[in-house]
Curated annotation (Swiss-Prot):
Cofactor: binding comment: Binds 1 Fe(2+) ion per subunit.
Main location (coarse class): cytoplasm
Binding residues for Fe cation: 120, 124, 310
Protein name: tRNA N6-adenosine threonylcarbamoyltransferase
Keyword list, A-Z: Acyltransferase, Cytoplasm, Iron, Metal-binding, Transferase, tRNA processing
Organism field: Geobacillus kaustophilus (strain HTA426)
Gene name linked to the record: tsaD
Signal peptide feature range: none
Pfam families the record matches: TsaD
Binding residues for substrate: 142-146, 175, 188, 192, 281
Length: 342
C-alpha cells in the first residue's frame, strides 16, 4: 500500500446475495462500517425446511435496489464519494448471485467506478478485520451452512486451504439433525440452545480421519444421530432432544476445535480467526476460547454475531483489500456458483 493510498480515505460499497440474505454495506478504509443493511428471507424459506433457490432469487430482485439505497443513505455518502463497488461473485446459488453481480455491474458502469469480485469465504474471513488488525501468518476456521474449512494465510489475499469437509459441512449436519429432532429451520441456533440445557451423555462418533489430516467429515455423525433416533422410535423409547443436541454439538465442536488448535501449532501462526455463520454458535465459541489457552501467544479473534452470518460489510472489507492491491474485475464479471478460493 503506497503512502498516498494510506493518507486517502477509501470508501467501498459491498453487495452480498449468495444465498438467502440481500445485503449492502459501506465500509471506510476497510475498518469502519458506515452502514450494514441485511434483508433476510428466513420466514419465506422456513416452511420448506431449507432455502428454495427460485424463491431466494425472486426476493433478491425485489429487495436489492431498496437495500443498496438504504445502505448509501445510512452511510451518508454519495456514489461520487465511492472508490469501488465490491460484490460476491461466488460461491453460492447461481440465480441469487446473479442479482447482486448484475446490480454491482450496473452501478459500476453508471457511476464510472471500479468493480471488484469477492469470494464469499474470503469475505467471511475478512469480517475479522472489523474486530482486529490481521496478523500474518494466520489460520481461519470457516464454518457455515455450505463450508467447513481451515484456511492458512501468509499475507493479504493469499489463501491455502489446509483442511476441508469431505462430505457434509457442519452447518448442513446441524440442519439435518435439527429436522430429525423436529426443530424449526434454520436448525443451528435451536441445537445450540438445546445443547446448553442438556448433557453430552450419548456416545456419538468423532471423525478424526487419518493421522495428520486437517479434513473434516460429518456424514457419519449425522447418520449415527438419525439411526439412534430411528432405533429408539422402533423400540417405543424416547430420546431427550436436549441430551441428543448436547451430544451432537460436543462431537462437532470437539473435532473442529482440536484440529484448529493442532494446525495453529504446526503452522506457527500469530492469529486464529473464527468465521462463517456457525461461528455464531455459543458452544463452538466457548470451546475454542478454552482450547486456545494452550497457545497463549496466539491471538484468537471472534467476530460479533452480526458479522458471522452473511452480510455485505465483510464483502466491502475484502473488496477494499483487493482494491488496494490494484485488483479489478471488468463488466464481463459473472456469477460462479462453485468459485474456488485458491
Amino acid at each position: 500500500m503506497g503512502e498516498a493510498e494510506m493518507n486517502e480515505d477509501v470508501y467501498v460499497l459491498g453487495i452480498e446475495t449468495s444465498c438467502d440474505e440481500t445485503a449492502a454495506a459501506v465500509v471506510k478504509n476497510g475498518r469502519e462500517v458506515l452502514s450494514n443493511v441485511v434483508a433476510s428471507q428466513m420466514e419465506s424459506h422456513r416452511r420448506f425446511g431449507g432455502v428454495v433457490p427460485e424463491i431466494a432469487s425472486r426476493h433478491h430482485v425485489e429487495q436489492i435496489t431498496l437495500v443498496i439505497e438504504e445502505a448509501m443513505q445510512q452511510a451518508g455518502v454519495s456514489f461520487a464519494s465511492l472508490d469501488a463497488v465490491a460484490v460476491t461473485a461466488g460461491p453460492g446459488l447461481v440465480g441469487a448471485l446473479l442479482v447482486g453481480v448484475n446490480a454491482a455491474k450496473a452501478l459500476a458502469f453508471a457511476h464510472g467506478l471500479p468493480l471488484i469480485g469477492v469470494h464469499h469465504i474470503a469475505g467471511h474471513i475478512y469480517a475479522n478485520q472489523l474486530v482486529a488488525e490481521m496478523k500474518f501468518p494466520l489460520l481461519a476456521l470457516v464454518v457455515s451452512g455450505g463450508h467447513t474449512e481451515l484456511v492458512f494465510m501468509k499475507e493479504h489475499g493469499n489463501f491455502a486451504v489446509i483442511g476441508e469437509t469431505r462430505d457434509d459441512a457442519a452447518g448442513e449436519a446441524y440442519d439435518k439433525v435439527a429436522r430429525a429432532l423436529g426443530l424449526p429451520y434454520p436448525g443451528g441456533p435451536h441445537i445450540d440452545r438445546l445443547a446448553h440445557e442438556g448433557e453430552p451423555v450419548i456416545d456419538l462418533p468423532r471423525a478424526w480421519l487419518e493421522e495428520g489430516s486437517y479434513d473434516f467429515s460429518f456424514s457419519g455423525l449425522k447418520s449415527a444421530v438419525l439411526n439412534a433416533l430411528h432405533n429408539a422410535k422402533q423400540r417405543g423409547e424416547e430420546i431427550d432432544p436436549r441430551q441428543m443436541a448436547a451430544s451432537f454439538q460436543a462431537s462437532v465442536v470437539d473435532v473442529l476445535v482440536t484440529k484448529t488448535v493442532q494446525a495453529a501449532k504446526e503452522y506457527r501462526v500469530r492469529q486464529v480467526l473464527l468465521a462463517g455463520g456457525v461461528a455464531a454458535n455459543r458452544g463452538l465459541r466457548a470451546a475454542l476460547q478454552d482450547k486456545m489457552k494452550e497457545l497463549p501467544d496466539v491471538e484468537l479473534v471472534i467476530p460479533p454475531l452480526s458479522l458471522c452470518t452473511d452480510n455485505a460489510a465483510m464483502i466491502a472489507v475484502a473488496g477494499t483489500v483487493l482494491y488496494q492491491q490494484g485488483k479489478r474485475a471488468d463488466l464481463a464479471l459473472n456469477a460462479n456458483p462453485s468459485l474456488p478460493l485458491v
